[in-house]
Amino acid sequence: MKIGVSSYSLSRAINDGELDVFSAIEFIKSIGGEHMEICPGAIGTFESPDDPRIEQIKKAAADAGIDLSSYTIGANFLPAEGEDAVEHKKKEVERLKKQVEIAAAFGVKFMRHDVAWRPIEQTSYDQFEEDLAFVVDACREVADYAAQFGITTSVENHGYHFQGSERVYRLVKLVNRPNFRTTMDVGNFACADEDSVAAVNNNISIASFIHFKDMLIRKNSVCPAGFFPTRSRKKILRGTITGHGDIDLKTCAEIIKASGYDGYISIEFEGPEVCKGAVETSINNVKALFA
């Protein structure tokens, strides 16, 4: 098992010019991280496997002695209103195939992509059932393409619609490919009003990659600045330093250890705290859970 950091966790420092991707790698190494998950949104976008930055980033990671663990990108197989659904899905699948080639150029064996986004009011179970088969076909095609590179693709439990552990489990089982799994974020289940301990227990058997995130969970009916609603809108959430929130991370870690999972674990921090200090505290707290 290797514990490291998603570059997304350092987005604010990167956007403010305090870090770039190369100093982020050095920072992750300096706080005891063993890998960096590549999140292009935080470090720029990549449109070609021949982008010279890829080799530069690979060399920087190798020189620092940390792995590049996963390539994490956005996607949405569902069309916008008025858009042709079949044509949109075809274009999105082809775009993701190009991103698979970029992941392969980075030398990673894991790639997470989103599958579907809808506003909260359109994320009912009936709507999920209506969208499921459409999304399954797209995920299967991307996974089949990734197989030639030895890459496992995955869906993360986020974005409200394909977020609860049952929905994620059904998607993975229906795609029915050995190289399509889930990037399991232990904190994100709260967004779907789900207990993280129960959800981790449900999804650990299909996890190829794990995010450790923590949340403050409140039952307030009013959503103040900095918080966001759960799917039911009955609770509100705010990201925080891993180990400082309300997710039962200790029990989640116990389930993960008992499962025999021996892959990568990424700190994914998205709270208001200063990100560099927050990430350092987070990685120390998660290491203690797995000591």
Residue ranges and their predicted role:
Residues Y8-L10, C39-G41, I73-N76, A116-R118, ...:
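Active-site beta-loop-alpha junctions enriched in small/polar residues
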Residues N15-I28, K90-V100, A192-V200, L249-C252:
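Short, acidic/polar
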Residues M1-D20:
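Boundary/entry segment of secreted carbohydrate-active catalytic domains
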Residues K59-D67, P79-T182:
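Active-site acidic/histidine proton-transfer and metal-coordination neighborhood
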Residues H35-M36, V136-D246:
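Acidic/histidine-rich catalytic cores of soluble enzymes
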Residues E37-K58, V115-E121:
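Glycine-rich, proline-tolerant flexible connector loops at the mouths of alpha/beta enzymes
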